[in-house]
């Protein structure tokens, strides 16, 4: 029996571990959009999943001007430094002999990366949304500051809620959701309570909910 192709929005996409898992299960899929601001992760994603090579970077003929590439990458907060709380300076490559701008701009284009999730007004419909939100503030190796809306990086989880609520209004909810994160999310009592509440919210707006 032939498996039907599904469309995917991969949020906090990193290097594409979620779409790799989907494909390893033998499920054909089409990536509608990704969302990440780690420029090196986007570069890796495009290399692993989208056919980005040095040869392609050198032979691609449809680049906009360097000023425009720098503007576009800055606009989506690609490379934003959270420790220094400042955007990446893409404009420093405008007059460079290197092809840094071309490399990252093309990686961003091929991976269909929308950049900073907090800047997105809505997401186009996809059957499946995956979201591996930052574990910085909940993992044992992290700051343990918790999932606080608008205050911590792990609080970016609430951007998914915002986009789902918008999708609900647009009658464009996904059929499936997959959240991936560290085990402690279900171990600490505060996190456990929060995540049970999250599942309750998801049950209100989506079709298929499960915990693995």
Question: Language-model features: where?
Answer:
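Conserved active-site and SAM-binding loop architecture
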Residues: 1-212
């Amino acid at each position: 029996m032939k498996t039907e192709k599904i469309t995917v929005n991969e949020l906090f996409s990193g290097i594409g571990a979620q779409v790799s898992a989907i494909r390893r299960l033998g499920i054909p899929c089409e990536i509608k959009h990704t969302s990440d601001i780690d420029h090196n992760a986007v570069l890796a994603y495009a290399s692993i999943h989208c056919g980005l090579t040095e040869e392609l970077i050198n032979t691609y003929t449809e680049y906009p001007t360097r000023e425009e590439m720098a503007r576009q990458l800055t606009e989506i907060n690609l490379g934003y430094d959270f420790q220094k709380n400042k955007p990446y300076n893409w404009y420093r490559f405008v007059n460079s002999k290197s092809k840094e701008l071309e490399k990252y701009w093309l990686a961003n284009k091929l991976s269909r990366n929308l950049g900073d999730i907090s800047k997105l007004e809505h997401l186009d419909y996809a059957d499946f949304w995956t979201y591996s939100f930052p574990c910085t503030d909940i993992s044992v190796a992290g700051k343990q500051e918790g999932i606080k809306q608008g205050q911590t990086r792990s609080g970016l989880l609430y951007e998914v809620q915002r986009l789902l609520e918008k999708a609900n209004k647009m009658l464009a909810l996904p059929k499936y959701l997959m959240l991936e994160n560290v085990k402690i999310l279900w171990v600490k009592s505060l996190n456990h309570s929060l995540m049970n509440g999250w599942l309750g919210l998801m049950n209100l707006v989506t079709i298929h909910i499960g915990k693995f």
